[in-house]
A protein has these predicted regions:
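Active-site-proximal helix/loop segments of hydrolytic enzymes
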Residues: 1-175
Length: 175
């Protein structure tokens, strides 16, 4: 959405009450031999600025008497969101790399990382950013342009989302 319409995808996902958010990207690096897939999640629990942003985004009123309670609730919400996002990121990374290896060819697994990406800030649902390969690497650029690779990345993400949703449904049913 962002490139085509000038929007952050969360401008659509948050008001629509989305259950999760996946942002797809092609990576780049000055060293043209860099390759691989990596998945990021936002971990705001330790970031004061992000915690204040979450307070604002979640509409918490930080009145004098309730300020500490609101901060505790915001911190708990941020930690729960980071845990869910990390779990989703792990599933996406695992399914995308395994699927590409099985159906397209070898791929470097660069792992799951947390970072302060603008596109993930303010998500009111588990949110991840997937770097599907390095467009600065000629071989990966060709791979990224191939329908076969794109289909397998999409299929891997779909498998991860299905697993994540089933797991969330089991947790909700157990409550």
């Amino acid at each position: 959405l962002s490139g085509e319409f000038g929007l952050n995808g969360l401008d659509v996902a948050n008001p629509a009450g989305g259950d999760l958010f996946v942002s797809l990207h092609a990576n780049a690096h000055p060293r043209r031999n860099r390759d691989g897939v990596e998945t990021y999640f936002l971990n705001v629990a330790a970031d004061r600025y992000a915690a204040r942003l979450a307070e604002r985004e979640n509409g918490l009123d930080l009145g004098e008497g309730d300020e500490q309670a609101a901060r505790i609730l915001t911190d708990l919400d941020a930690k729960a969101s980071a845990l869910s996002s990390r779990r989703l990121a792990s599933l996406v990374q695992q399914e995308v790399t395994a699927g590409v290896r099985a159906r397209v060819g070898d791929v470097r697994d660069l792992g799951v990382k947390s970072a302060l990406f603008y596109v993930l800030l303010g998500a009111r649902m588990p949110a991840v950013l997937v770097e599907t390969g390095f467009i600065s690497n000629r071989e990966e650029e060709r791979r990224l342009a191939s329908a076969r690779y794109q289909d397998e990345v999409a299929s891997g993400i779909a498998r991860a989302v299905t697993q994540f949703s089933r797991s969330a449904a089991r947790v909700a049913a157990a409550r």
